[in-house]
C-alpha cells in the first residue's frame, strides 16, 4: 500500500530492503469515487507498477503472500504462487499491510491483468445498476456518492447518521455538498 511504499523508499537509502507484496503494483486506496466511476483515469494515477518508483530500485521485491512469521528465527515464509515457498530472513520486520476496511482489500496474489479484470467487473456492475446505495457520510462516502451521481444514469442514495453529511466539517462546506448532492 501507500505506507509500505513510502517506508521502503525511505529505508532503502540506508538499509537492504526486501518488499513483499501480493501485487506487482501499488494499488492505492485513494480516490475511491474516481476508481468506481472512471477506472481508466484512476488507473493512470493510482495503480502504479513498483518498477515505476525510481526510489524502489534498491528494494528487492518478492511477489507473493506471507504465510507465516517466525519471530524467534527472524524469518517470514512467502508463498510465491508459481515459484513455491521462499524463506526470507530479516533483522527488522516492518508490517505495512494496508487498510482493512476497503472493499478491494484482500490477501490474494494477483498480477496486473487480474487487477484490471477486477476493476472492469466493478465498473460493469455499477454501470448496470439502476440504484446505488452509499452508506457513510464521511469524506469517502460523500465523494463516492458525488462521483456516481455526476456520472449519471443511476439513482444514488447517500445514507448517513446525523442531519447532514460530513460531520466535523465547516458548516459552509456541509451546506455546499448537500446542495451539490441534491442537484
Mark where each language-model region is.
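Glycine-rich Rossmann-fold phosphate-binding loop(s) that bind the pyrophosphate
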Residues: 1-2, 135-138
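Beta1-alpha1 glycine-rich phosphate/pyrophosphate-binding loop at the start
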Residues: 1-60, 146-172
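Conserved N-terminal glycine/acidic-rich loop preference
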Residues: 2-3, 25-42, 109-122, 129, ...
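Alpha-helical segments flanking ligand/cofactor-binding loops in enzyme cores
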Residues: 9, 124, 146, 178-179
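Short glycine-/small-residue-rich flexible loop motifs, especially phosphate/cofactor-binding loops
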Residues: 51, 91, 178
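FAD-binding core/adjacent interface of flavoenzyme oxidoreductases
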Residues: 56-133
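Short loop/edge segments at beta-strand edges and connector loops
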Residues: 62-65, 160, 183
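Glycine/Thr-rich phosphate-binding loops of Rossmann-like dinucleotide-binding domains
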Residues: 103-104, 143, 166
Amino acid at each position: 500500500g501507500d505506507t509500505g511504499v513510502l517506508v521502503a523508499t525511505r529505508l532503502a537509502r540506508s538499509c537492504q530492503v526486501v518488499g513483499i507484496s501480493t501485487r506487482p503494483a501499488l494499488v492505492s486506496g485513494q480516490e475511491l469515487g474516481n476508481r468506481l466511476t472512471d477506472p481508466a483515469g484512476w488507473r493512470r494515477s493510482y495503480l502504479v507498477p513498483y518498477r515505476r518508483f525510481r526510489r524502489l530500485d534498491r528494494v528487492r521485491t518478492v511477489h507473493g503472500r506471507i504465510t507465516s512469521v517466525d519471530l524467534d528465527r527472524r524469518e517470514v515464509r512467502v508463498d510465491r504462487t508459481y515459484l513455491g515457498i521462499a524463506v526470507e530472513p530479516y533483522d527488522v520486520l516492518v508490517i505495512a499491510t494496508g487498510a482493512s476496511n476497503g472493499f478491494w482489500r484482500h490477501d490474494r496474489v494477483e498480477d496486473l491483468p487480474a487487477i484490471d479484470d477486477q476493476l472492469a467487473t466493478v465498473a460493469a456492475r455499477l454501470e448496470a445498476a439502476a440504484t446505488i446505495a452509499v452508506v457513510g457520510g464521511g469524506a469517502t462516502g460523500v465523494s463516492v456518492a458525488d462521483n456516481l451521481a455526476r456520472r449519471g444514469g443511476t439513482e444514488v442514495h447517500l445514507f448517513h447518521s446525523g442531519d447532514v453529511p460530513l460531520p466535523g466539517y465547516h458548516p459552509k462546506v456541509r451546506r455546499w455538498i448537500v446542495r451539490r448532492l441534491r442537484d
